[in-house]
Amino acid sequence: MTKAYSTRVLTFLILISLMAVTLNLFPTVEAKKRSRDAPIVKGLSWNFYQKACPKVENIIRKELKKVFKRDIGLAAAILRIHFHDCFVQGCEASVLLAGSASGPGEQSSIPNLTLRQQAFVVINNLRALVQKKCGQVVSCSDILALAARDSVVLSGGPDYAVPLGRRDSLAFASQETTLNNLPPPFFNASQLIADFANRNLNITDLVALSGGHTIGIAHCPSFTDRLYPNQDPTMNQFFANSLKRTCPTANSSNTQVNDIRSPDVFDNKYYVDLMNRQGLFTSDQDLFVDKRTRGIVESFAIDQQLFFDYFTVAMIKMGQMSVLTGTQGEIRSNCSARNTQSFMSVLEEGIEEAISMI
């Protein structure tokens, strides 16, 4: 019997034994219906653009189908940008802003250096398509929230309604603020639980949102602390050996898929990875190690629909964190710059040219 076969058999036996347990921890309902039952903050609504831009969701999904057909990896990249936006200042598209004379933008902060630049281009292209059809009425923050949802759906995950009506921020966070608000991959379960609780996200939300790692890639330095100088004892040895081949040194520039079983499919295999001690980050694997979150991991591993149901609820909750609504903020014409910046840039260039002629 080969080692790989033994691992598969062990996985199967674990899942079978867990399926024999009666699970009353979570109720299961249809994800789309459940999402509509989620509470929404004042200023957002399920049909915000019904009159101003009724086809906005169709425009975005149609374009993303083309984009992901060329590069499915962009689905995970867009989803990650949405997470990184919401966890810093709230879901107001500040992560999309490029740096300015006031300083570097959020994209220059260490946790955001590995965000794919092409994904930002995709968001701006969506902005242009929507604006061409409807005018400047749909915010970049709403476009990003819808694009994140469609990244999940078009990768095989659940469809869900997205409350709309967000406005775009007028400023980006400092690099320090950005760094301090994004949970690092070396956080353990206790640190994650506390961090999420500060955002009114509970333990189930934490485990469900972590399931976003079922797609995408990670750069070696984000997890090699578990390999060098000493190997994390919670890591499967065969998995560790594979990672060491991918990342021969702690600072290797190589990348590794987050989910070794189905890296480009949004499913529940991420939780199966954790049960087999094949989670990539400490923040992943410790969800199975810690008794407070282990049961949720096990439940999601054996019931994909259960995971989908709770993921959609958690995404809707996260997508409403510290949103701007009404007359707050603005609706950007270009997602990477404030509306006034285009004019100011021209003015500054004119002043510089005039000074050079003196």
Curated annotation (Swiss-Prot):
The record marks 80 as: Transition state stabilizer. Binds 1 heme b (iron(II)-protoporphyrin IX) group per subunit. InterPro entries: Haem_peroxidase, Haem_peroxidase_sf, Peroxidase_pln, Peroxidases_AS, Peroxidases_heam-ligand_BS, Secretory_peroxidase. Substrate binds at residue 183. This is Peroxidase 12. One of its GO terms (biological process) is response to oxidative stress. Induction: Induced either by incompatible fungal pathogen attack, or by methyl jasmonate, a plant defense-related signaling molecule. It comes from Arabidopsis thaliana. Its cofactor is heme b; Ca(2+). Ca(2+) 2 binds at residues 214, 259, 262, 267. There are 73 peroxidase genes in A.thaliana. GO terms for molecular function: heme binding; lactoperoxidase activity; metal ion binding. It comes from the Eukaryota. Removal of H(2)O(2), oxidation of toxic reductants, biosynthesis and degradation of lignin, suberization, auxin catabolism, response to environmental stresses such as wounding, pathogen attack and oxidative stress. These functions might be dependent on each isozyme/isoform in each plant tissue. Exhibits a Ca(2+)-pectate binding affinity which could be interpreted in vivo as a specificity to interact with the pectic structure of the cell wall. The gene is PER12. Belongs to the peroxidase family. Classical plant (class III) peroxidase subfamily. Expressed in roots and leaves.
